[in-house]
Amino acid sequence: HRVYVEMRFTVRDCSSLPNVPGSCKETFNLYYYETDSNIDNKISTFWNESPYLKVDTIAADESFSQVDFGGRLMKVNTEVRSFGPLTRSGFYLAFQDYGACMSLLSVRVFFKKCPSVVQNFAVFPETMTGAESTSLVIARGTCIPNAEEVDVPIKLYCNGDGEWMVPIGKCTCKAGYEPENHVVCKACPAAMFKANQGMGICAQCPANSRSTSEASPICICRNGYYRADFDTPEAPCTSVPSGPRNVISIVNETAITLEWHPPRETGGRDDVNYNIICKKCQSDRRGCSHCDDNVDFVPRQLGLTDTRVFISNLWVHTPYTFEIQAVNGVTNKSPFPPQHVSVNITTNQAAPSSVPIMHQVKATMKSITLSWPQPEQPNGIILDYEIRYYEKDHHEFNSSLARSQTNTASIEGLRPGVVYVVQVRARTVAGYGKFSSKMCFQTLTEEDYKSELREQLPLIAGSAAAGVVFIVSLVAISIVCSRKRTYSKEAVYSDKLQHYSTGRGSPGMKIYIDPFTYEDPNEAVREFAKEIDVSFVKIEEVIGAGEFGEVYKGRLKLPSKREISVAIKTLKAGYSEKQRRDFLSEASIMGQFDHPNIIRLEGVVTKSRPVMIITEFMENGALDSFLRQNDGQFTVIQLVGMLRGIAAGMKYLSEMNYVHRDLAARNILVNSNLVCKVSDFGLSRYLQDDTSDPTYTSSLGGKIPVRWTAPEAIRYRKFTSASDVWSYGIVMWEVMSYGERPYWDMSNQDVINAIEQDYRLPPPMDCPAALHQLMLDCWQKDRNSRPRFGEIVNTLDKMIRNPASLKTVATIPAVPSQPLLDRSIPDISAFTSVDDWLSAIKMGQYRDNFLSSGFTSLHVVAQMTSEDLLRIGITLAGHQKKILNSIQSMRVQISQSPTSIA
């Protein structure tokens, strides 16, 4: 250590002393001597100067004279000297005077140290200074309770003056503790936490979490809430999402497009994605198993971020169940399986697979005869084969085509000695399959042909002789047989044919049979509809009334099958035989159809009362009312998906030569997955004269739904698939307008007159131009110019594959290419109240919203904004647009008219 000596003393100025000898001094010396024992022997040599070490000669800064002494003004000096380092237990100080007139007033001996201190949340002990005045002594610190070191070990330096300097490292409060006054780490109270070590303070527990003890580094999630592995402790606890909504499935042969709405509840997270679980089922949808690896999912099967997936390579005519799971970052933390929505579909017939191989049967100079096996997966009846061939040295673009009704073909008109590349593909009613792999075959050269001919000459001669003998024998036999032949009348067919080959149909295509062609209508019912024992049927509730009786929701439990929901049409008591025949004719019609977009007949009950027709149950009911209830809630792609399903069903019906005659949104049913199915195949309304329903108007002895019917069908009763296409165009308009009434409040006669004058419906609000153009195509006056349903399906498929084509919204040009009906905006001056105005624009359901919020006059209503509509409870986007458009027109009319408006 180093020792400091503070001396207070006075010195008299030598010049102020009279008769001062020359030995007068004004300084003295300071010495020290280290020892391990007391030295108090007067004769000891240690009292001599020699063992002492001189510290310094001490001189006074100020001295005093005799004058000062007389006035008692002593000038005291204070000097501090240090020495060291000391290595022994003690030391002696010595002051040597060489003749100075001085007084040593006091001596203070001390050493310097750095005091104990708390700095940077660490405690540093009392530390002695170093041996030299410039020395720095390192002091190691210890973190205070509930604090931890950060990075490097913490230390301070004690300098020669006893001051701390140069701090290195620090401690901070550990997780669960917060700093207080920079010297204490205080525990976080209950309901608060601190996740990390550092200077941060405690915070309230995030949403859906709690802490019940002090010093919590993390808050525990409440029941049903979780944190993902990558979530920080500061993040709120979240839950799993609810299931996806409003699934639309579009089946295209052995592929399907699925679309859906996101879950209503995301669990408080923004990382929702979707998994598709594919299950292939038996025909009764029992014994489902996971799909194999051959099924393709685009963009992928798991972790989808978009609400759309395209699935292909499915089996033909096979029931599938697809589960669309909604998952997020905490789904794997929940003990429960992900929420999902299921959709059941049945694939259609696909095109055949490729032909595996070809064989050369024969070759000549100008022809090649080939044969091949049937495709491994014909997926239907092979109608014919198409052969593509071209010279190997030429490009594929120069290929030629040939067709064969069998699996052999002779390609004629070839060049001698040339190698040809040949491919073949099969065709069914579903279309062409893929071409086979390329194979090469060569025609004979002239030399090869002559050589082969020489080898066959003996065989040809022998065959000719045998042929003459055979012909003579054959003539004799034919003479004998002709005498025994008798002609009989053609046998009468005992069974009705269910498959015809017509000029329009393809071989093997099932054709619709009109049940009214049966002499006994019961025969048609037995042939096309399955009889169900009434004990298997349970009626639950009335859901409507049909033309012949009430309609119920019920349950059907067939033996060895699961129970399903069904719709049950009943025939009211007191029916006539004609009414019974008409009632059951719909079942005879439905029973002939098997398509995912046609309502499915489960069976009939005819052996007990009441007579029943049992069909699959469609949860969302009729399409028109469903759209009105969900105005503005679907994307354009979802609406197009609905239209595509309806068109696919109608394509199926038209290919069976069935004409619907009453295609309208009210006759389309919607299930829980938003799959649309064509229904209502009863013909009785056309045979009666019931004026109770204004939708149907008498024409030429029958009932016609004028607003949906093609002009040739109204005028001439000419119903064809082309007239169904016209009706489909009206259905398109209904869908895009969310269930508005076609031609609004026009009378049926006004509608007929407008159509005859070539007026057509304008595009509904926000309707894509491409869809309105398709409507106009369906409404061509010349029925031969209208598209077929197959073309409509293809057009809609292209729109679905290219959503950008639907972004252009249709507008009515100043000079339209075709005159469009104008639903003129009502004259505001004709209204006397807000109630009248709302009724005129078909928004009367919001009357109480307006009046209870103070919007009681049209002048006040004219100033409303979209925010006002939200505030009074109008949340549907479609209704907001409709009301705002009318309000905007109201403002214009108010500004242009001086008429007083209520």
From Swiss-Prot:
Every Eph LBD domain range: 1-119
The reaction(s) this protein catalyses: L-tyrosyl-[protein] + ATP = O-phospho-L-tyrosyl-[protein] + ADP + H(+)
Ranges facing Extracellular side: 1-459
Tissue localization of expression: Expressed in the embryo in the brain and spinal cord and in the first and fourth visceral arches. Most abundant in adult brain, with lower levels in eye, heart, ovary, oviduct, lung and pharynx.
One GO CC term on file: early endosome membrane
Cleavable signal peptide: none
Gene Ontology biological process terms in this record: axon guidance; cell chemotaxis; cell-substrate adhesion; dendritic spine development; dendritic spine morphogenesis; ephrin receptor signaling pathway; establishment of cell polarity; positive regulation of synapse assembly
Segments crossing the lipid bilayer: 460-480
Sugar-modified residues: 252, 344, 398
Summary of subunit composition and partner proteins: Heterotetramer upon binding of the ligand. The heterotetramer is composed of an ephrin dimer and a receptor dimer. Oligomerization is probably required to induce biological responses.
Name assigned to this protein: Ephrin type-B receptor 1-B
Protein source organism: Xenopus laevis (African clawed frog)
Gene: ephb1-b
